[in-house]
């Protein structure tokens, strides 16, 4: 699936039609969001930007030290978004490409941060707050950091509850230990996820392509 946010008469409009991308000018497009992209969608975007998009397997295999790269015209960045489950968290690789002020995001599942931002941008409908793809990328990171902070707050409350249960002399049985172990794993995942984003943001801010 493809969603294109583009400038039209000083407002921001959207299109979910691949053919529209071929009709739009390079200066019109702000954000191309690809969710489980088809081969045709990827090829059309690659031709439009004159660059190569990473596959999901490539994005997932990239080591943390190599999650950022750039060419003369394009920035490539990869990070993981945490998806909370009933007990444990999972991660979803997201690729970001910025070329000449156009942001491309590539993912395989719906993500609340991106969906909410698209709704907000279209509701405001003005280009004043989001004149380029760089501004949209910053907004995505801000929204994601807020969600990560919410997860940390929830885990802090869970840790506090476990501490109270121990203080009250509750029997530390196998289920209790399993819950503690899962909480530790979740905490480590959130920490690694936050550090991963810090590295990505730091690299982008250091780039001479960032306005």
Predicted regions and their residues:
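Peripheral, non-transmembrane regulatory/ligand-interaction domains of membrane transport proteins
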Residues: 1-210
